[in-house]
């Protein structure tokens, strides 16, 4: 027992030793006290800091326990793997090198550093301030591994989450003024206030709320079904993702920031063009850029959508998007069962979901359009990283232009009543077997291959390729390219 007014310097506690501190203990090494397991009230060994007691520069090793009761205080404790600190008083400058810190009701932990495999549990009625979290996310993004990093059931203030760090805010917990850097993340089941994502991620789960989050470059806020975000600001190269059933209100989307959502979510806020809304299956005034994406689902609609460089508008069959503005680098994903109308770099374009007729499409940068059976695409331009797919019974009209890096995929017999200009790749595909879905494929003799025919009035080669299949089994059947009434020119 170290009595009040006494000071003990150095020493080791082993083999069920017990030190009761009312005075001051400096430089102790503790390797006993956890005989009944971590954070177990049955433990009686180790170092106990009582009301008015102080411990400085303590080392807690495997199996060791430092217990800080109400009114006690410790500083500069280092806890290795297998050791723990049970805190009902105050602890400053604790380092968890694989060890654990359990902050109980009334306890306050200040400037705890949680290194690899370390764990801090902040319980209801407890507080942790200025914590640095360097572990917890090694299992991958949003993995619910709650045995490393920081778990918050009480209050955590001014936490810094670095690469590989994770803070899990439980349903009854609150995290305030957290900064998350690249490679770290915050999982929110309770309340997160004023989080800054400097390349890090924030996941807001069902029942969780996040207010005042700032998403900076490479940061990502994900609102899951039943989650709520309020007053999120998305700066350049930041991303806000709102899943179906999630809600984000009072969003400020700055230029260069990305919004990823669908018409099954609720998102309300402002962007560089004014106010926008996504609610009740309708989207209005959404701006998509820099990795942003809006999915318009079947039976839902969108109006006045702007798709800029890096943005994607995806319209499902039975969905409708009107007054769309597509600029250079924007991507449209749809099929002939969707209804879309607007303008792109070539002028007006449209898709009539009832007739299956499309006109003036520009597909680039990941954009794609599928012409279903009975549908037709007229005057289509497929740019770099764009794809035009035609099902059996789909057709082309007017001028179909494939630029370098573009693809046209034929899943059946297709007729073009106009011109095809090819600087990209034309693929004859086979939906019935994976064996034949190969560029420049030679079909195996026993493979169930269905060969296709492309018929066009004119074909102009501009250095593109046409990938056709042939069966080498004596029949020599193959895909076919038929020039009907016109000519083939150029180089393919």
Give the predicted meaning of each segment.
Residues 15, 34, 81-83, 115, ...:
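Short, solvent-exposed coil/turn segments at beta-strand boundaries
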Residues 18, 27, 40, 144-146, ...:
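Intrinsic-disorder/low-complexity loop/linker signature
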Residues 35-43, 138-147, 436-443:
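Intrinsically disordered, low-complexity Ser/Thr- and acidic-rich flexible linkers and loops
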């Amino acid at each position: 027992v170290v009595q009040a007014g006494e000071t003990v310097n150095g020493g080791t506690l082993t083999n069920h030793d017990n030190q009761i501190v009312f005075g001051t203990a400096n430089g102790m090494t503790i390797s006993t006290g956890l005989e009944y397991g971590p954070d177990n009230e049955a433990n009686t060994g180790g170092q106990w800091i009582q009301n008015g007691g102080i411990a400085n520069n303590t080392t807690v090793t495997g199996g060791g326990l430092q217990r800080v009761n109400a009114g006690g205080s410790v500083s500069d404790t280092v806890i290795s793997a297998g050791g723990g600190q049970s805190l009902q008083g105050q602890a400053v400058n604790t380092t968890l090198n694989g060890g654990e810190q359990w902050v109980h009701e009334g306890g306050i932990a200040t400037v705890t550093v949680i290194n690899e495999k370390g764990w801090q549990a902040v319980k209801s009625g407890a507080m942790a301030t200025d914590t640095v979290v360097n572990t917890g996310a090694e299992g991958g993004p949003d993995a619910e591994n709650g045995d490393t990093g920081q778990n918050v059931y009480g209050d955590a203030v001014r936490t810094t989450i670095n690469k590989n760090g994770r803070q899990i805010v439980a349903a009854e917990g609150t995290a305030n003024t957290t900064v998350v850097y690249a490679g770290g993340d915050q999982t929110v089941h309770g309340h997160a206030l004023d989080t800054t994502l400097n390349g890090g991620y924030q996941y807001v789960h069902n029942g969780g709320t996040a207010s005042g989050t700032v998403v900076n470059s490479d940061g990502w806020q994900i609102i899951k079904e039943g989650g709520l975000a309020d007053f999120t600001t998305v700066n350049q190269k930041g991303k806000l993702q709102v899943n179906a059933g999630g809600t984000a209100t009072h969003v400020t989307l700055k230029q260069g920031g990305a919004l990823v959502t669908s018409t099954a979510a609720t998102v309300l806020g402002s962007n560089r063009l004014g106010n926008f809304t996504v609610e009740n299956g309708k989207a209005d005034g959404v701006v998509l850029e820099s990795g942003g994406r809006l999915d318009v689902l079947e039976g839902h609609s969108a109006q006045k959508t702007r798709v800029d460089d890096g943005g994607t508008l995806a319209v499902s069959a039975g969905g409708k998007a009107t007054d769309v503005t597509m600029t250079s680098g924007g991507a449209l994903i749809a099929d002939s069962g969707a209804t879309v109308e607007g303008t792109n770099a070539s002028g007006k374009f449209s898709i009539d979901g009832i007739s299956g007729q499309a006109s003036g499409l520009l597909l680039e940068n990941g954009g794609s359009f599928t012409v279903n059976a009975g549908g037709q695409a007229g005057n289509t331009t497929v740019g770099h990283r764009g794809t035009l797919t035609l099902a059996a019974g789909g057709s082309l009209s007017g001028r179909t232009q494939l630029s370098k890096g573009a693809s046209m995929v034929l899943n059946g017999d297709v007729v073009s009543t106009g011109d095809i200009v090819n600087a990209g790749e034309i693929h004859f595909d086979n939906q019935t077997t994976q064996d034949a879905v190969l560029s420049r494929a030679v079909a195996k003799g026993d493979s169930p291959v269905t060969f296709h025919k492309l018929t066009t009035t004119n074909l102009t080669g501009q250095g593109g390729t046409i990938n056709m299949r042939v069966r080498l089994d004596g029949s020599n059947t193959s895909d076919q390219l038929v020039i009907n009434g016109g000519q083939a020119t150029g180089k393919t």
